[in-house]
């Protein structure tokens, strides 16, 4: 079943005009496995590019150069963790028609300040190059100049999103995770399929009980692992159609 723009707009109006039954907040990055990958990713981002220089450049242990590389490694790890793989803060509102929520990356204010400061330094460097070299300076540095101007207004962005309840609702519940996946076999439209996060398992349980009480056709499926949901017929049917 496909949803046209008019139907989608009607669903959105109904969702936002419905009474809010429950609200909750959560700060999350993903399932537990994603957290582990993020740790290894941040460590790799800081160590892998720089450690070869320490071993092959004959840098003495405890020297200024050594500690300089260590500082660069730590900065790389922090950048990877907080800028490229940040947590997300979700603020959910449950209604009888679905859920609307906001999604914002949790990036420290210091990171925004640093990036904006770096952008202004980049602009100053480009202007200096223009004064010394002339217009030819932007042949090589034009891209950096455009990027620098764009980053001067770098600030946190809040995204507003919705997920609607189909006539038939599937709740996949990985019992060890503080998350659920909502889906349906009524349509493959993305507005009916969403992953939701919670601050605790008790909060998740309360949400599930509320959904069961307000929706008359809920298929609740507890899972041992997140990927067990892909054994469900709705995913097998999609594979057959492809």
UniProtKB/Swiss-Prot annotation:
Main location: host cell
Record-annotated membrane-spanning stretches: 39-59, 66-86, 118-138
Phenotype seen when the gene is deleted: Deletion mutant is susceptible to killing by V52 strain in a VasX-dependent manner.
Subcellular location as annotated: Host membrane
Keywords recorded for this protein, A-Z: Host membrane, Membrane, Transmembrane, Transmembrane helix
Gene Ontology terms: cellular component: host cell membrane; membrane
Top-level taxonomic group: Bacteria
Membrane topology: Multi-pass membrane protein
Transmembrane helix as UniProt keyword: yes
Function: Immunity protein that plays a role in preventing early activation of toxin VasX.
Protein name: Immunity protein TsiV2
Organism: Vibrio cholerae serotype O1 (strain ATCC 39315 / El Tor Inaba N16961)
């Amino acid at each position: 079943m496909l949803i046209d723009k008019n139907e989608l707009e009607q669903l959105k109006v109904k969702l936002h005009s419905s009474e809010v039954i429950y609200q909750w907040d959560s700060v999350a990055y993903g399932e537990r496995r994603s957290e582990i990958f993020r740790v290894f990713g941040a460590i790799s981002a800081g160590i892998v590019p720089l450690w070869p220089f320490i071993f092959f450049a004959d840098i003495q242990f405890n020297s200024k150069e050594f500690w300089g590389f260590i500082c660069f490694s730590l900065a790389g790890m922090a950048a990877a963790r907080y800028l490229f793989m940040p947590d997300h803060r979700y603020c959910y509102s449950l209604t009888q028609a679905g859920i609307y929520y906001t999604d914002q990356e949790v990036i420290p204010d210091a990171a925004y300040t640093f990036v904006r400061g770096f952008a202004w330094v980049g602009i100053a460097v480009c202007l200096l190059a223009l004064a010394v070299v002339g217009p030819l300076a932007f042949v090589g540095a034009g891209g950096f100049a455009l990027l620098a101007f764009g980053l001067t207004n770098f600030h946190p962005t809040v995204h507003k999103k919705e997920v609607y309840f189909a006539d038939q609702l599937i709740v996949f519940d990985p019992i060890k995770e503080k998350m659920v996946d909502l889906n349906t076999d009524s349509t493959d439209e993305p507005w009916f399929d969403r992953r939701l996060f919670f601050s605790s398992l008790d909060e998740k349980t309360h949400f599930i009980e509320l959904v069961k009480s307000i929706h008359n056709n809920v298929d609740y499926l507890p899972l041992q692992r997140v990927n067990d949901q892909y054994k469900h017929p709705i995913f097998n049917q999609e594979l057959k159609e492809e």
